[in-house]
Amino acid sequence: MNNAIILGIIWHLVGAASAACFYAPFKQVKKWSWETMWSIGGLVSWLILPWTVSYLLLPDFWQYYGSFSIATLLPVFLFGAMWGIGNINYGLTMRYLGMSMGIGIAIGITLIIGTLMTPILQGRFDVLLGTPGGRMTLLGVFVALIGVAIVSYAGLLKERAMGIQAEEFNLKKGLILAVMCGIFSAGMSFAMDAAKPMHEAASALGINSLYVALPSYVIIMGGGAIINLSYCFIRLATLKNLSVKADFSVAKPLLITNILFSALAGLMWYLQFFFYAWGHAKIPQQYDYMSWMLHMSFYVLCGGIVGLLLKEWKCSTKKPVAVLCIGCLVIILAANIVGLGMAA
């Protein structure tokens, strides 16, 4: 395994760690509705940071985006909106299935679809099956899926041991939402593939290869922002128990800390895809679809580790933690298998 691939895997791990931790600042927000908190974090992560970073990177911000046709930008935007729908469904999936089952099904589906659909649609899947490296990377995807399933099972054991249940358990509704979440969340992977002309144009402007994907986030995350923010704003405007005015009428010190913690969560969310771009740049082009598999499997891995560090796994038996550790080791094994396959 060469140094570039190792670096790519490491950067994907860093991005996934940021994703696994981003909700922690939100837990410090007090006396605000979820919709207000999510909107403030979203404004930072989906609009302010992508636009600011791109403005600093590009020699001529408006000329860069103006150089692309609608036919190029629209799929990127729509796949971003597709991801936004998946993002909303994610929360509803947890509501009806609980964390462990919801994460296991939703992440498992988005890992498979986001990773394999691109080479299938591009007619590259037969080539992958016909090469040793391709077969090894596909084996890595399968092993990662097993790891996700094991970690999810550990979560189920933990929930049972601690007496935790889904907010409104509904298997039929939850499964439908989990499948929808898994499919739509893969939109981010499809958007990155559709944005390749934007990456190439950024590279032609002399932008470092680590940063060429970042300008495309203005369009990708713009699509996701419209879906997420519209959902929040509609709820804030129509539900009687929600009020932006009430949220912003809290004591000034609390208002400032709420804004800062929400903004920090937004920054951490953005950093997952900042480092995703770095990792993506180091992955061999013929295996670029593997970036999504690495990100999603590392997200589950880091989520488990963060849970251990925050002592969320303190329950009456040791079995859940033991199963969690096995699942994490399987995901690490999967990343190594994929890395060796890409280097073959």
Curated annotation (Swiss-Prot):
Keyword Transport found: yes
Transmembrane helix in keyword set: yes
Reaction(s) this enzyme catalyzes, per UniProt: L-rhamnopyranose(in) + H(+)(in) = L-rhamnopyranose(out) + H(+)(out)
One term under GO cellular component: plasma membrane
Compartment(s): Cell inner membrane
Database matches in Pfam families: RhaT (PF06379)
GO molecular function: rhamnose transmembrane transporter activity; symporter activity
Keyword annotations of the record: Cell inner membrane, Cell membrane, Membrane, Sugar transport, Symport, Transmembrane, Transmembrane helix, Transport
Membrane topology: Multi-pass membrane protein
Coiled-coil spans in chain: none
Transmembrane segments: 4-24, 38-58, 68-88, 101-121, 137-157, 175-195, 207-227, 259-279, 290-310, 321-341
Family, similarity comment: Belongs to the L-rhamnose transporter (TC 2.A.7.6) family.
Role noted for this protein: Uptake of L-rhamnose across the cytoplasmic membrane with the concomitant transport of protons into the cell (symport system).
Name listed for the protein in its UniProt record: L-rhamnose-proton symporter
